[in-house]
């Protein structure tokens, strides 16, 4: 998920979707924004790992609130092996950085947000996923307060689905 921007009803819808899909881990690609909205993530049935976005101001408070619910805030970038897949997570403010991650050959999956436009593509044998914004999706080039999106990864099949909230 990405770009929740303190919109609590959208965060709740995303959490409901993740719990109903029985996900093992939630990765948030940044722009939670304010620490108060982190409390909603306590309702997740799994752990959440986040990176910071360009609108995440009080990162110390975000980190503290996330740690209180068993989550983590990793800064601008997170890379790890999850389910046997090498995953890179970044907000995606700099498209050149996302492209470098894809071309590096180090990752099976690169996840970014920032653009609010959901997509899934294969590039250089890498699964590239932008879950869009759970709060303010882009529709026909315009930021809206419509139905947001999240993505669900299937690490075994190396595939992803975009789900509307």
Task: State where each predicted segment sits.
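Short acidic, glycine/proline-enriched helix-loop-strand junctions
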Residues: 38-50, 124-128, 132
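Short linear motifs in intrinsically disordered
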Residues: 67-72, 109, 140-143
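N-terminal active-site segment of His-dependent metallophosphoesterases
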Residues: 1-43, 47, 57-59, 68-71, ...
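Active-site environment of divalent metal-dependent phosphoester hydrolases
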Residues: 5-9, 33-36, 55-61, 94-99, ...
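Helix-adjacent hinge/juxtasegments
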Residues: 45-95
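Active-site neighborhood of phospho(di)ester-bond hydrolases with catalytic His/Asp-centered motifs
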Residues: 1-2, 25-31, 48-54, 88-91, ...
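Binuclear metal-dependent phosphoesterase catalytic core
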Residues: 79-83, 99-100, 105-106, 122, ...
